[in-house]
Amino acid sequence: MDVEKDVLDVYIKNLENQIGNKRYFLKQAQGAIDEITKRSLDTEGKPVNSEVFTELLRKPMFFSERADPIGFSLTSNFLSLRAQSSSEWLSLMNDQSVDQKAMLLLQNNINSDLKELLRKLQHQMTIMDSKKQDHAHIRTRKARNKELWDSLADFLKGYLVPNLDDNDESIDSLTNEVMLLMKRLIEHDLNLTLNDFSSKTIPIYRLLLRANIITVIEGSTNPGTKYIKLIDFNETSLT
């Protein structure tokens, strides 16, 4: 143990001497540079002796020591730090119990799912763009549905119902009655029968029948009952 300490002390002492020497040489070199710079300023305009300059370049400016303890020390310190950081990283990786192959497989599956999702979204966007109509004021299907119901109510109250009014009942009351019948038709109320049309709304029944947009079906359990049903516009031609 004492031998190792003695060797270490000698090494440290040698290293300190080398550092001191390098500082001395650097100081001497800096002084020489300053002197040359000063002389060049004082002798500005005089020609430089090329032979003297060539002779100077033939001589080595610096001889590095063969042992170079400073270089060895820096290299040793760098390698020690690298070894320590590598050891810490390997220790951290060894502590993790995650299977690397499973992680890669999971990532590949996620990437595949994301790619498929993106493809479907792009396809859906293409379909939506092809069917897009210029209805910027309508934001949702619910808003569109409300707009259609409101349009139907306006049509009934402003055009159709006034032609049915016999002055015995207000337009608003008759409009509500007709609107209820139309709503039951549109929502495919299976219990809607001819008896649900009053004497004031029976003209609506005749109008729809002449337009071929309703069907009248005789009840199977009650032959005297006539059920009224709206036609399927996707399958029936109105011509």
Curated annotation (Swiss-Prot):
- Main location group: nucleus
Q: Name one GO biological process term.
A: chromosome segregation
S-S pairs: none
The alphabetized UniProt keywords are: Cell cycle, Cell division, Centromere, Chromosome, Kinetochore, Meiosis, Mitosis, Nucleus
Name the family the entry cites: Belongs to the CENP-K/MCM22 family.
Additional detail:
Present with 1026 molecules/cell in log phase SD medium.
Q: What does this protein do?
A: Component of the kinetochore, a multiprotein complex that assembles on centromeric DNA and attaches chromosomes to spindle microtubules, mediating chromosome segregation and sister chromatid segregation during meiosis and mitosis. Component of the inner kinetochore constitutive centromere-associated network (CCAN), which serves as a structural platform for outer kinetochore assembly.
Q: What is this protein called?
A: Inner kinetochore subunit MCM22
